[in-house]
Structure formats: structure tokens, C-alpha cells
């Protein structure tokens, strides 16, 4: 009985140490990116050039980091279209790779969404001065769409390069410089 209790306590200590060190892996990599950034770009929709305002906030969480981003476009007819995303990321066993923590898991943690249900599979990586977020969608016909957000550190804030690819075809590219507030 005492032997089993000792093993249980050691296992709990080992699991706790793993989660503490596992969580700490990602924290230093995100520090240079932390902050609030704003900017704008011009996008073309149906042959019309439209201004798009961009807003990004990168913050630390207890488990990793969070990225909130919003784009606001004034359409030619005056309507305002806003899209926003708010995704937390946690470290993985790979030093520079982070999984999205978008849905509660069975054991109280969080997990990515399910791409087989039409939900985006999202992950991030940090390589050098670039934070990249990937969003993979599996389409109804079995094809795919991949959205890539490269956010590279610059003297004034972040350089954003966005790409949207469907079944190997480049559908959209957006570039902008975002200023850190």
C-alpha cells in the first residue's frame, strides 16, 4: 500500500514537472512579439480597391500566448465588414511549434478544432523574428484551403504577409506594415 502511494506521488510530481517545463518552453519565444499593432492595406474585391484596417494584439497567457486580430473593410456601398479571430496557443513537444487551444478537452485542457468537421486546424510557429499562424480547412469536396499569416518583427512593429491558397492555387496575398502602439 505504501509502495503504491509512493509511486503515485512520484508520478504526480513527474507529470507536474513535465507540464511546468512544457508550458515554459514557448514563453521566451513570444516575448518580442507582445503588444498591440495597427495598420491598413488596400485589397481588391470584384475589381474595386478597398481600404482595410488591421488590428493585432499578441499577449501572454498562463499556458502560452494569444493572438487577436481584426480586419475592418468599408465596402463600396458603405457597408462595414469586420472579421475577427481570437486564438490561444500552447507549446507542443516541438520547440518552435504551438497548437491552437480553441476547444475544451475531456480532461480540462484545451485542444484544436476538428478539420474533418469543416473547422479550421490552426497552429503557429516562431522562427527567428517571424510568428506564423497557419489555418488549414478541409473543403466539402476533400480539397483544402490554407491561410498563412506571417508576422515579422520590424523597427516600427510588424510586417504582415497573408496568403490564401486553395488546392495549390494562390487566391489572395496581402502585405502591410503594422505599427506598435
Which residues fall in each region the model found?
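Bacterial N-terminal signal peptides that target proteins for export
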Residues: 2-12
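Central antiparallel beta-sheet cores of small beta-barrel/beta-sandwich binding domains
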Residues: 40-139, 144-146, 169, 179-181
